[in-house]
A protein has these predicted regions:
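Low-complexity, glycine- and small/polar-enriched segments
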Residues: 1-429
C-alpha cells in the first residue's frame, strides 16, 4: 500500500496483522538471493582488506614502541625485556603498549570471524545456484508520510516494510491472542506488539542421502520513520509486552521511542547453513591392478549465525519498560544522540552464540584379491564458537533498572558523556 500523504490503518475490535506472502517452490533457483549474497560477500571482503591493513599498522606501531625497550640476551640473539622497572619509569609506554596489544587481539579476532563468514557466504553462493525446494517470502510494504498503525487489541507484523517519510507510529491498546501450548514451551509469551521476520528456506537433496544441504535466511521486518518511530504498548497488563525479533527499527533524522507497560524483548533470529557430502572412489595398483584401495570421504559443514535486531535513531533511542528489558545481540545505534534504557524491573543485555563447524573424515580400505589387509581412518574437525554481543553506539549511554542489570559481552562505544549504568532505582528498587 502506497499513500501519497498520511496512512492510518486501525482496528476497533480485533488485532492488526501485517505479514509477508509465502511462496513455496521446488526446482527453483533464486536470482534475488544470489544477488543479495554476492553483495554481502563483496562487503565482507572489503572488511577483510581493512582489517588486514589495520593489523599490519598496529604491528608496525608495536615494533616502533618495542625499539625503545631495553634489550638482553646474547650478542647473536637479542631479546626485548619488558621489565616492571622500565614501565614504572615510563608509564606512558606501558599504557601505549597495553593499548596496542588489546587493539591487535581485537582486530585479529574480528578478522578470524570475517574469514569464517566469508567461507559461509561462499558456500551459500555455490548452493543457491542449484535448484532447491523450500519457500521464500515477499514482504508486505506500507509507505506514506505519517504512518499510524493502531489496534484495539494487538499488532502483529511479520516480514513487512513500513516506510514513513515523516513519522511511523504504532500503538496497541490490547493484546494479541494467547500463545499456543507448543509455542509457550519454546519460551514465547503473550504480547501486545510483535514485530518479527519470517524464514526463507532452501533445501537440496534428501535427508540421509550422500549429498544433502539446506540454508535458512531471516527475512526481517523493517520499520522506518525519517523524523521518528514511536512504538507504544500502554495497556495496563503484565502481558502488554513489545517483542522485536530479528528486525530493524530506524529513524535517520529523529528518535526511536519504545514504551511498554510489560516486558520489552529484543531477540535474535537464527540463520543457518548445513552441507553434507559423502563420496567414495577406488584406486588400483600393481602390474595387474589387483591391489585395490577404496577411499570414502565425508565432508560436513555447519554455520549457525544469529540475526540481531537493530535500533537506530539519528537523535537517540529512548526505551522504557514497566517490566523487564531483555536484549539479545541487539545493536543500539545513536552515534549523534543518547541511548536511554529504563526498566522498572531487570535490565539484561545478552550475547548470542555463533557456531562454525567444519569436519572432514577419510576412510581407506586396502585389499588384495578381495581380501582386506589394511584399514585407515582419519578425522579432522574445527569448531569455532563466538558470541555476538549487544552493542551500544552513542554520544552517551544511560541504563537504569529497578532490579538487576546484566551485561553479557556487551560493547559500549560513546563519544561524549560515556555510559551511566544504574541498578536498584525506581519504584521496584
Amino acid at each position: 500500500i502506497a499513500a501519497g500523504k498520511d496512512l492510518t490503518v486501525g482496528t476497533t475490535k480485533g488485532q492488526l496483522n501485517i505479514a509477508g506472502l509465502r511462496n513455496t517452490f521446488t526446482g527453483y533457483i533464486s536470482k534475488g538471493k544470489l544477488d543479495e549474497l554476492q553483495t554481502t560477500l563483496n562487503f565482507m571482503e572489503k572488511q577483510q582488506v581493512q582489517y588486514d591493513q589495520e593489523i599490519a599498522n598496529i604491528k608496525l606501531d608495536i615494533r616502533a614502541l618495542e625499539a625503545k625497550f631495553p634489550r638482553g640476551g646474547s650478542f647473536f640473539r637479542k631479546r626485548i625485556i619488558l621489565s616492571e622497572e622500565y614501565f614504572n619509569q615510563n608509564p606512558s609506554d606501558k599504557i601505549a603498549y597495553d593499548s596496542l596489544r588489546q587493539k591487535l587481539a581485537f582486530s585479529e579476532k574480528q578478522l578470524e570471524k570475517i574469514k569464517f563468514d566469508i567461507q559461509a557466504t561462499n558456500e551459500s553462493i555455490k548452493l543457491i545456484q542449484n535448484p532447491a525446494a523450500g519457500h521464500e517470502h515477499k514482504s508486505a510494504v506500507l509507505s506514506g508520510q505519517n504512518i499510524n498503525l493502531l489496534s484495539a487489541q494487538g499488532i502483529n507484523i511479520e516480514s513487512a516494510k513500513i516506510e514513513a517519510s515523516k513519522q511511523a507510529n504504532l500503538q496497541a491498546a490490547g493484546l494479541l491472542p494467547v500463545v499456543s501450548e507448543e509455542d509457550a514451551k519454546q519460551g514465547e509469551m503473550r504480547s501486545a506488539i510483535n514485530i518479527g521476520g519470517l524464514f526463507d528456506t532452501y533445501e537440496y537433496g534428501q535427508r540421509s542421502s550422500n549429498n544433502y544441504a539446506y540454508m535458512i535466511f531471516n527475512q526481517p521486518s523493517e520499520i522506518y520513520g525519517e523524523m521518528g518511530v514511536n512504538i507504544f504498548a500502554p495497556g495496563q497488563s503484565a502481558d502488554s509486552r513489545i517483542v522485536i525479533n530479528a528486525s530493524d527499527i530506524i529513524s535517520d533524522s529523529g528518535k526511536v521511542t519504545l514504551k511498554s507497560y510489560g516486558d520489552l524483548s529484543l531477540t535474535a533470529g537464527q540463520g543457518e547453513l548445513y552441507t553434507y557430502n559423502k563420496h567414495s572412489y577406488t584406486k588400483r595398483s600393481g602390474k595387474l591392478k589387483i591391489k585395490k584401495k577404496t577411499i570414502t570421504e565425508i565432508k560436513e559443514y555447519n554455520n549457525v549465525k544469529p540475526d540481531a535486531s537493530l535500533l537506530s535513531g539519528g537523535k537517540g533511542l529512548d526505551i522504557q519498560s514497566g517490566g523487564n528489558i531483555y536484549a539479545y545481540a541487539t545493536l543500539f545505534d545513536a552515534p549523534k544522540g543518547s541511548i536511554n534504557l529504563t526498566a522498572s524491573k531487570a535490565l539484561k543485555l545478552f550475547a548470542v552464540e555463533e557456531l562454525n563447524y567444519n569436519k572432514l573424515e577419510s576412510h581407506k580400505k586396502s585389499s588384495f584379491l578381495g581380501i582386506t589387509y589394511n584399514k585407515e581412518n582419519s578425522s579432522n574437525s574445527k569448531k569455532m564458537h563466538t558470541a555476538l554481543p549487544s552493542k551500544l553506539v552513542a554520544e552517551a549511554v544511560n541504563t537504569r533498572s529497578g532490579w538487576d542489570t546484566l551485561l553479557e559481552g556487551t560493547e559500549f562505544k560513546t563519544s561524549l558523556e560515556g555510559a551511566t549504568i544504574q541498578a536498584g532505582v525506581g519504584e521496584n528498587a
